Each structure stands twice: as C-alpha cells, then as structure tokens.
Amino acid sequence: DFVQVMWHGASLDATTAGYLTALPLLVMLVSIWLKRVPLKKLLLPYYIIGAALIAIVFVVDMGLYPFWGFKLDASIFLYLDSPKEAMASVSVGFILLRLLVMVLLTGGIAWLMMKITPRELETVKNKILGTLGMLLLGGFLFVIIRGGVTESTSNVGQVYFSSNQFLNHSAVNPCFSLLSSMGKSK
C-alpha cells in the first residue's frame, strides 16, 4: 500500500515541486545575462518562506486529518476566525509538539535548499544557448505543473486509486489540496 500511495501521489508532488521551482528557474534565467548574481542571497528569503509554508501545511494537515477525516483545504480559514474555539479541543503539548516539528522542518528544508544552491552561477559563455536551455527547462516545468499534455490538468482526484479512502487521501499532496481548494472557493 505504501508504494502505491507514493506512486500515485508522485504526480501531485511533482506539480507542487514545479510551482515551487518556477521562481528559482527565473532567477537562474536572469543570471545568465548578468554577472555574478548572488543566487544564495537572492533565494534565501524565498527558501525560508517557502519552507515555513510547506512545514505549516504538512504539519497542520497531519494534525487535523485524524479529527476531520479529510485533507486540509480552504475550510481551515473558517476556523482561523475563532482560533480559541478551534484550539480548545487539543492540549498545549499537542500544539507545542507540532510547532517544534514545523520549526525543525522549516530549518531542514531551508538548509537543504541552501546547500544545493550555488553561491553564484559560473559565467555562461554562450548566453543564447544558455537561455534556450533554460527556456526548454521552463517548458518542461510548465508541463509538470500542468500535469501533462492531455486535456485534463492536475487535480486532487487524479491520485485516487483505491476503494480505501485513507489511501487515496494519503496520496494527495496537502499543499496542492489546500491551494486547489482555495482556487475553487473564490
């Protein structure tokens, strides 16, 4: 079951990763034409904010799923109007543990991203070829974000594969689920 959840969920994970990769790709595209762009310095705030948002969404999803029985979606914002009522049913320890996990995840993700990001790109000798290569990568990224080249785009239902609803929910990327439901609730 674990392998099937991972396999079926990979498409939404790829879509979510594609969205998160778009800004660094644009920064790298611009850095082809400029000299000594400080990639790490430019991307550090993006990495920290992105890592914090990912950590918050994943931890909140894991914390709420046992109570709600469905993936995190835009309905969470209805409860944020009255946070005291929302937190009245859980212990302080429950909340503190999740806050600790959020901090550790944020730090771990941001640290990893900084580790794999070069301080600056080496000078690209053929800027036209470098630009074409980055645009080709951008096109590939667009296909990943869209979910392929077929008529249907990425959606939560595409990862459902089982009669067991828990397995289907496990395959859904919580960041994708939240953003998708926010787009539909407007």
Where are these regions (language model features)?
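Transmembrane and membrane-interface helices of multi-pass
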Residues: D1-K184
